[in-house]
Curated annotation (Swiss-Prot):
Its EC number is 2.3.1.35, 2.3.1.1. GO terms for biological process: L-arginine biosynthetic process; ornithine biosynthetic process. The gene is argJ. It comes from Pseudomonas putida (strain ATCC 47054 / DSM 6125 / CFBP 8728 / NCIMB 11950 / KT2440). This is Arginine biosynthesis bifunctional protein ArgJ. The record marks 115-116 as: Involved in the stabilization of negative charge on the oxyanion by the formation of the oxyanion hole.
Length: 405
């Protein structure tokens, strides 16, 4: 079940960015599993990609090509084209070349993206056979259809949209994402596509994407696994009648940054809310760290602990598991006598032990909620970090045990 995730909000079209969806029948006949996105001429494109050493063939190709002129993005679901070696790279190149031929653009201007089962050959002919239909379907209004088209084990499509005014001109930022498992970015089995009609210099756009991803997609985790295929792309078409953003400063940049960050955060958190088998949406907030890295180390130790995640599923306030995770996070010279731990506003541990004011009934009441905050005060400094995660349920095991059947 998706925790607090409802129908898609209104996804405003972005002038200069079109999406087309078609069926290749990669995993199921009739399933719309190929999405083509067209960027207007002159668009700037930036991306962040998985750090998994076994990154998929489309990731290798997209990382090479994103530095040049990008006109099309080609996504398929049902097959990750990962762990496929040189033949997989050739297959990705072939699908891009076919799309380029049909669209009349250089092959190097097409970026491929794949998600699905790892280690199986990409069904090139099926994908090639769907490309013309996807091109024929191109429209600025197809965001919702594309959000559904990129889904794998997701139960709901994910998207967000913002608009703001600058000098009387409306600027739009719209994005979609997919992902429900194998989520522990830097990046994870997650794909994200965000577009704006602002005109943004490539260097500014790249930094904006990196910063936005770092504060959103790189702060979510479901199962601790980092996928071979993660990518998040930010496209600026330049169709809004405004000056180009050439510096990371000024009113237009700040408004754009706010909109991009909000869209990134909303679609990233939607991935957690739709986590495979998730029944809880959990915020892990770590304050008082000596540096940001030790805050992240503590946060991920808590967020990845199977014992904590199963306690969350059972609504069991087993606070000792949280203390154990904090203690093994590897923070040097950690003084446990300074640490306080909270479930929402309930102090469950103080100065390294059970809080004198804590009762089991208080903890149980918080743990019974669908949305929970675990707050850890380290008492070592001024740094803070926040991570979003889920519980671990029977359904998660079932989904992943049956994924290939």
């Amino acid at each position: 079940m998706a925790v607090g995730l409802g129908p898609l909000p209104t996804l405003h079209p972005v002038p200069g960015f079109e999406l087309g969806i078609a069926s290749a029948g990669i995993k199921r006949p009739g399933r719309k599993d190929v999405v083509v996105m067209r960027c207007a001429e002159g668009s700037s494109v930036a991306g962040v990609f998985t750090l998994n050493a076994f990154c998929a063939a489309p990731v290798i190709l997209s990382k090479q090509r994103v530095q040049g002129t990008v006109r099309y993005l080609l996504t398929n679901t049902g097959n990750a084209n990962a762990g496929t070696g040189a033949p997989g790279l050739a297959a990705a190149e072939r699908t891009c070349a076919k799309l380029a031929e049909l669209a009349g653009v250089p092959a190097e201007s097409v970026l491929p993206f794949s998600t699905g089962v790892i280690g199986e050959p990409l069904p090139v002919e099926k994908i090639e056979g769907a490309l013309q239909a996807a091109l024929d379907n191109l429209s600025e209004n197809n965001w919702a259809e594309a959000a559904t088209g990129i889904m794998t084990t997701d139960t709901l499509p994910k998207g967000a949209s913002r608009q703001f005014q600058h000098d009387g001109v409306t600027v739009t930022v719209t994005g979609i994402s997919k992902g429900a498992g194998m989520i522990r970015p830097n990046m994870a089995t997650m794909l994200g596509y965000i577009a704006t009609d602002a005109k943004v210099a490539p260097k500014v756009l790249k930094d904006l994407m990196l910063d936005g991803a770092n504060k959103s997609f790189n702060r979510i985790t479901i199962d601790g696994d980092t996928s071979t295929n993660d990518c998040c792309m930010l496209i600026a078409t330049g169709k809004a009648d405004l000056p180009e953003v050439t510096e990371a400063s000024g009113a237009l940049f700040e408004a754009l940054k706010k909109a991009v960050f909000e869209v990134c955060m909303e679609v990233a958190q939607a991935i957690v809310r739709d986590g495979e088998g998730a029944t809880k949406f959990v915020t892990v907030q770590v304050n008082g760290g000596g540096n940001h890295q030790e805050c992240l180390d503590v946060g991920y130790a808590v967020a990845h602990s199977p014992l904590i995640k199963t306690a969350l599923f059972a609504s069991d306030p087993n606070w000792g598991r949280i203390l154990a995770a904090v203690g093994r996070a590897g923070v040097p010279e950690l003084d446990v006598s300074l640490i306080d731990v909270y479930l929402d506003s309930v102090c469950i541990a103080s100065k390294g032990g059970r809080s004198p004011s804590y009762t089991e009934a208080q903890g149980s009441a918080v743990m019974a909620q669908e949305e929970i905050t675990i707050r850890i005060e380290l008492g070592r400094g001024q740094c803070s970090e926040t991570i979003w995660t889920t519980d671990l349920s029977h359904e998660y095991v079932k989904i992943n045990a049956e994924y290939r059947t």
